[in-house]
Design a protein with these regions (language model features):
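Glycine-centered flexibility sites
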Residues: 12, 65, 89-91, 101-103
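Non-cysteine beta-strand/loop elements that form the S-adenosyl-L-methionine
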Residues: 33, 85-93
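Feature marks short, surface-exposed loop/turn motifs that line or immediately flank catalytic pockets
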Residues: 39, 92-96
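Glycine-rich tight-turn/loop motif centered on a GG-T
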Residues: 96-112
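Conserved small/polar residues in nucleotide/adenosyl-binding loops
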Residues: 114-116
Length: 116
């Protein structure tokens, strides 16, 4: 079985500079952007999306969202920017994140999660 190292998405930590440094130390590592809300992707000029994957080939983006339509629109935008994976955050236990009904709060709504 192939071993892989994944660097979890961490707000304020896994920015493009950190990921670049890690990629110099470990060639076969999975890297992720910090979590970004799907609405921010849909309602922005995509600066975050462009900036966070400017020079890296193997980067996943982690999004948070609870509206299936918004998540699909965000995923469509992301596909245009050379990310190799879209990761839906359903595990963040932060109260701030849960207050937005995303992250681990989605686990309390399994039927909604199916639609996303």
């Amino acid at each position: 079985m192939e071993k892989r190292i994944s660097v979890a998405p961490m707000m304020g930590q896994t920015d493009r500079h950190f990921r670049y440094m890690i990629s110099l130390m470990a060639k076969d590592v999975r890297l992720y952007t910090p979590m970004i809300h799907a609405e921010a992707i849909v309602n922005s000029s995509n600066n975050f999306i462009k900036r966070e994957n400017g020079y890296q080939k193997k980067v996943g983006i982690q999004i948070a969202g609870n509206d299936p339509n918004v998540v699909v629109r965000a995923a469509t935008i992301i596909e245009e920017h050379n990310y190799n994976e879209i990761n839906l955050n359903i595990g963040c236990p932060s109260e701030r994140v849960q207050n937005c009904s995303v992250g681990v709060a989605l686990m309390k709504q399994p039927l909604s999660l199916i639609h996303i």
